[in-house]
């Protein structure tokens, strides 16, 4: 690519934002080695070896270091490594990689997910990350979690799919869900979603994008960020 085209591309808002986040990660680093030193190395090795030849899609998570590196970036992008202690709720927490890093940075953490993959339960125990077992469903509120949160996050989850059809929630389902999440946020709390793409490659319909924006979100491709809470 010619230099002029590279410069032009970097001046595009999306490219600039993503480049700035990468630069911030390199400046404000989060070492993983001290965190890894706190967990049972023999247990890590045993889990990895046991799933090494598994053909199950989830078996990839038994090799924990790539997923810790990915979730370190998520923590850095939300600036949780530069924040005073917060209460963090992660929806669809899986094996707890994101919350493990957040907890090691001094935050109080809680995950919500269904109990359908034994590996995830093993990893949560390894990381000492607490989880509430709960299936998130359309038009159903979350349970009483005993506290309100400064942050509610969700990364690459599938709770907004109807099963088994895989049909995605529409604006009515999402609006109910956002209204319910507001009940679990402290005043001024933040919500971040990292969405999976549709089969078309888009992340949401135009109507859903408009809903997110109307409720106060900054929308950047898969990133839906309610930095100042929700507007109803």
Residue ranges and their predicted role:
Residues 95-105:
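Conserved SAM-binding loop of SAM-dependent methyltransferases across substrates and taxa
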Residues 65-85:
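Conserved alpha-helix/loop element of class I SAM-dependent methyltransferases that forms part
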């Amino acid at each position: 690519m010619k230099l002029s085209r590279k410069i032009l591309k970097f001046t595009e808002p999306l490219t600039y934002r993503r480049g700035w986040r990468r630069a911030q990660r390199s400046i404000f680093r989060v070492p993983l080695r001290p965190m890894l030193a706190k967990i049972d190395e023999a247990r890590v090795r045993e889990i990895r070896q046991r799933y090494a030849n598994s053909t199950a899609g989830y078996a990839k998570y038994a090799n924990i270091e790539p997923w810790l590196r990915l979730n370190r970036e998520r923590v850095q992008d939300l600036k949780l490594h530069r924040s005073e202690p917060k209460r963090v709720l992660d929806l669809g927490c899986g094996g707890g990689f994101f919350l493990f890093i957040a907890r090691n940075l001094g935050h109080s953490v809680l995950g919500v997910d269904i109990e359908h993959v034994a590996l995830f339960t093993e990893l949560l125990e390894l990381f000492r990350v607490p989880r509430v077992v709960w299936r998130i469903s359309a038009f159903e509120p979350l349970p009483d979690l005993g506290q309100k949160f400064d942050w509610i996050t969700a990364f690459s989850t599938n709770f907004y799919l109807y099963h088994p059809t895989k049909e995605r929630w529409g604006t009515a389902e999402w609006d109910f869900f956002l209204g319910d999440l507001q009940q679990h946020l402290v005043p001024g709390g933040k919500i971040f979603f990292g969405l999976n793409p549709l089969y078309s490659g888009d992340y949401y319909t135009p109507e859903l994008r408009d809903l997110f924006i109307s409720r106060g979100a900054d929308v950047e491709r898969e990133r839906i960020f309610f930095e100042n809470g929700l507007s109803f």
